[in-house]
């Protein structure tokens, strides 16, 4: 069973996605929070054994430098630094945001012209999942990144050393459906409360994505960075 996650166009695209959630000016975002979310996202990709392009890892090293500088005690200097990596990054993000917005406008104009001057475009259908309130699989994935980091720390504190690698997505789908037998909704983090190791956590998440994809469950997130709620979309027979 293959579940594809829609890739970002690059590290700046991922960062812009994270920054845009705060709905403030780019220069006013809590940069350390954004950096932590970016690093958690990459850590989740690696834990799920998904390929991470080198450009994302390069950006991660730059972000770790910025984060370390932000967390260090402030030192009063006579002259400001010529090169501020944080300001440079935010400037790049601002420029990328303008470029992306302009490219989207051009793409829409091209589609309008194509309707009048060319044959109907035949598209290769990519089955992406549209969630309530314009949420995407990436939003669920980013929420899961935080849950996984917390679960990983919990398992580490328990000193758990035995791990299985034979969990099946189909079996986890049945377990999730069983969890809905007595209720119509669950919080995303509830699914992982009894997970014994990270392999089970990851397989449960993939099973959740598959159930969303086939419309067995739907997803809601009332506020930005709020709790993810899963709702049952079938009736008990």
From Swiss-Prot:
Q: Could you tell me where this protein is found in the cell? A: Cytoplasm
Q: Name one GO biological process term.
A: DNA replication
The protein's matches in Gene3D superfamilies, at most eight in alphabetical order, are given as: 6.10.250.2410
Keywords per UniProt:
Cell cycle, Cell division, Chromosome partition, Cytoplasm
InterPro entries (alphabetical)? ScpA
Query: Mind telling me which residue stretches traverse the membrane in this protein?
Result: none
Tell me any Pfam family this protein matches: SMC_ScpA
Q: What's a GO cellular component annotated to this UniProt protein? A: cytoplasm
What protein family is recorded? Belongs to the ScpA family.
> Could you tell me which PANTHER family the record lists for this protein?
SEGREGATION AND CONDENSATION PROTEIN A (PTHR33969:SF2)
- Functional description taken from the UniProt entry: Participates in chromosomal partition during cell division. May act via the formation of a condensin-like complex containing Smc and ScpB that pull DNA away from mid-cell into both cell halves.
Subunit-structure text = Component of a cohesin-like complex composed of ScpA, ScpB and the Smc homodimer, in which ScpA and ScpB bind to the head domain of Smc. The presence of the three proteins is required for the association of the complex with DNA.
Q: What is this protein called?
A: Segregation and condensation protein A
What does UniProt list as this organism's lineage? Bacteria, Bacillati, Bacillota, Bacilli, Lactobacillales
């Amino acid at each position: 069973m293959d579940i594809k996650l829609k890739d970002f166009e690059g590290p700046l695209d991922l960062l812009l996605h994270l920054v845009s959630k705060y709905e403030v000016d780019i220069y006013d975002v809590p940069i350390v929070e954004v950096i932590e979310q970016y690093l958690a996202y990459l850590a989740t990709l690696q834990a799920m054994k998904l390929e991470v392009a080198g450009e994302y890892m390069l950006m991660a090293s730059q972000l770790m430098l910025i984060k370390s500088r932000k967390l260090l005690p402030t030192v009063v200097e006579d002259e400001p630094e010529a090169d501020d990596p944080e300001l440079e990054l935010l400037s790049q993000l601002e420029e990328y945001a303008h470029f992306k917005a302009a490219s989207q406008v051009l793409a829409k104009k091209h589609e309008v012209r194509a309707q009048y001057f060319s044959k109907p475009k035949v598209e290769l259908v990519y089955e992406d999942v549209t969630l309530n309130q314009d949420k995407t699989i990436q939003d669920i994935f980013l929420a899961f990144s935080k849950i996984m980091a917390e679960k990983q720390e919990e398992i580490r504190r328990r000193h758990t050393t035995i791990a299985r690698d034979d969990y099946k997505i189909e079996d986890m789908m049945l377990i999730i459906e069983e969890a809905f037998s007595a209720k119509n909704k669950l919080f995303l983090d509830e699914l992982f409360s009894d997970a014994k190791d990270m392999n089970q956590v990851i397989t449960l998440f993939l099973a959740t994505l598959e159930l969303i994809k086939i419309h067995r469950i739907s997803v809601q997130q009332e506020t930005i960075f709020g709790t993810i709620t899963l709702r049952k979309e079938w009736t008990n027979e």
